[in-house]
């Protein structure tokens, strides 16, 4: 695990993370099957995957649609998870480690201002803090 990844992680979170990191990208459906998150098996998949996303260990790379027998997509998209390093490249991710938190906050605010030009500073701060 990289420097960022050395924080404590519970066993189930670590299993999920390692499964995703080992494959590069992995559909939630396959993750649940591989790690026995089904009736009578492990519980709490959504809790673990949400915690990993909130801590920036994994993110949703895409939504993939199942296909019918004619090859047409149908239904809801299934989340495909990946690590940030897989999506954006190791160098880009590790380059952000050198920034101090205030600089990161300013960069986020600047980006949000470009996307939401009518928003006030207070509204943008609220978006960041949640």
Kindly give the residue locations of the regions a language model identified.
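Short, amphipathic alpha-helical interaction segments positioned at domain boundaries
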Residues: 67-114
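Surface-exposed cap/loop segments at beta↔alpha junctions
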Residues: 16, 60-63, 76
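Short, well-ordered alpha-helical packing segments
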Residues: 17, 21, 32, 46-49, ...
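Single conserved hydrophobic/aromatic residue that forms the stacking wall/gate
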Residues: 1-11
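Short, leucine-enriched amphipathic alpha-helices that occur as contiguous helical runs
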Residues: 12-17, 28, 45, 101-109, ...
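Short amphipathic alpha-helical interaction segments
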Residues: 38-54, 60
């Amino acid at each position: 695990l990289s420097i960022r990844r050395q924080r404590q992680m519970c066993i189930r979170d670590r299993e999920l993370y390692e499964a995703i990191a080992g494959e590069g990208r992995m559909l939630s459906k396959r993750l649940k099957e591989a790690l026995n998150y089904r009736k009578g098996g492990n519980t709490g998949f959504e809790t673990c995957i949400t915690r990993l996303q909130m801590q920036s260990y994994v993110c949703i790379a895409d939504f993939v649609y199942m296909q019918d027998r004619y090859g047409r997509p149908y239904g809801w998209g299934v989340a495909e998870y990946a690590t940030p390093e897989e999506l954006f490249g190791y160098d880009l991710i590790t380059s952000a480690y050198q920034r101090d938190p205030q600089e990161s906050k300013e960069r986020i605010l600047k980006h949000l201002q470009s996307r939401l030009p009518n928003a006030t500073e207070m509204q943008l701060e609220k978006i960041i803090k949640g």
